Amino acid sequence: MWHDRWQDVRWRALAKSSRPILVGPWRSELGFETLYWLPWLAQWRHRYGISRERVTAITRGGAGAWYDAARSVDLYDYVPVAKVRQAMLRDSAASGSIKQQASTDWEAKLLPFIAQDLGLRRYVVLHPSLMYRGLTPWFNGQMGQTELLTHLRYTDVPVPAPPLSLPLPEKFVAVKFYHRHTWPMNDEIKGWVVNAVANVAKLIPVVLLESGLYADDHVDFPLSGPNITSLAGHVTPQNNLAMQSAVLAKATAFMGTYGGCQQLAVRLKKPSAGFYAKFEGTCYAHKIMTEWLAVQLGVPCFIGTPNDARFVKEILG
């Protein structure tokens, strides 16, 4: 995107102005938000000298805490979780993807209401579609990592402290196993997950990062047992992602489905193990970036199948 001369001229003009900037609304995948959107915004602000005081982040589930912005707005204060989920599913049906490749009509109608509540009359919108437009060549295998990294700036992700009302063990493993196309909730995988989590719980307390909300097409595996506690019941739509990140930041390690939560764990510099059954219907570039980032941060990161994990265990004795 930086190489688009006319877009570059536009951003430089914006940098010289004092107009407030509404960033978002982000309503899509957690992994893309942490792996690409946040570092893309950081690089954009750095390149054009945009002050954080001008930025209002619009996201959901309390994830505004992760943004280096003067303030944040939660989508769920304006739109129910079910309607945001329905919008994602409509996008998927229309384009085959839930990625925000373009601004939708309902987003265009919502933003003026948010601006009015913020007391803004003249403002600029930085929509996620701009990031997707710039990084699509990477997702499609037409951009090298060296060029990709000119678009991204990885900085520490700020997270809130967990509330005092949430009892957490001194040391624990955060766990989030959920159904997705690479990790379907069939009997074989469900049995493996139940056994794996129970084995971990024999060694160290387990805290499940489950919300009880149906914000997307992911469904948490039902887990319970000795030394296992759940975040469900302690979260609301407006704070569920903030709470999950707060707990994850306190964890000793993360284990779960390979995907967005593991990518957040890597961003938070937590050792992680993420699992898939078949690597289909997802972009290999995201796995590359997750592993690359873990190497840069010096954080252990395993991504593989149960058989891969079994092989590592056997070869190490």
Identify the residue ranges that each predicted region occupies.
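Active-site and donor-binding regions of nucleotide-sugar-utilizing enzymes
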Residues: 6-119, 243-246, 261-264, 275, ...
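Nucleotide-sugar donor-binding patch of glycosyltransferase catalytic domains
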Residues: 231, 262-317
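Acidic donor-binding loop of glycosyltransferase active sites
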Residues: 249-255
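Well-ordered, non-membrane alpha-helical segments in soluble/globular domains
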Residues: 37-44, 188-199
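Catalytic donor nucleotide-activated moiety binding site of glycosyltransferases and closely related
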Residues: 58-60, 170-171, 175-181, 191-241
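Short acidic-hydrophobic, aromatic-tinged amphipathic segments that line or gate anion-handling sites
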Residues: 74-86, 235-236, 295-310
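A nucleotide-sugar donor-handling region in carbohydrate enzymes
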Residues: 99-179
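Short, aromatic/basic amphipathic alpha-helical patches
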Residues: 62-77, 109-110, 218-227, 285-293
